[in-house]
A protein has these predicted regions:
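Conserved binding/catalytic microenvironments
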Residues: 1-137
Length: 137
């Protein structure tokens, strides 16, 4: 990832594919945060998602919702289930508003990560927050 940042200026913008790294602000940091989360590095991923989301415009609803869902999963992996629910609630609201299948997939991943708390009050809060999303399926 560190080496990739130095190669961004070599991306051919004439291609109809493969230039998301030039079109998406913070693209490499999004990829880094995603990788950290999928590797189970919840603390690192959560911190990076906080930074990334500070720069995602509110108008980029679908991307923002996906990133929020990934941030919520990272918070759960960092053993911060209450924070995960707080973030997940915002992602769920965006998912209902947009109908994004990609976001629903990320929220399903959040549900899996939150399974250790499914019988706890925080788990029930998550289920309640995600209920409108699951109703749309």
């Amino acid at each position: 990832m560190d080496e990739a940042a130095g190669l961004l200026n070599r991306v051919d913008d004439e291609l109809p594919w493969g230039n998301a790294c030039r079109r998406t602000p913070g693209y490499l940091e999004v990829q880094r945060a995603t990788c950290y989360g999928r590797l189970g590095l919840g603390v690192e991923a959560s911190a990076l998602w906080t930074q990334v989301l500070d720069h995602v415009p509110m108008t980029a609803r679908r991307d923002r919702g996906v990133y929020l869902a990934r941030h919520a999963a990272a918070a759960a992996k960092a053993e911060e289930p209450e924070h995960a629910v707080e973030i997940g609630r915002e992602a769920a609201q965006i998912a209902v508003e947009t109908g994004s299948a990609r976001m629903r997939g990320e929220l399903t991943a959040l549900e899996r990560v939150m399974r250790p708390w499914h019988d706890a009050p925080v788990g029930r809060e998550l289920a309640q927050a995600l209920a409108p999303v699951n109703e749309r399926e």
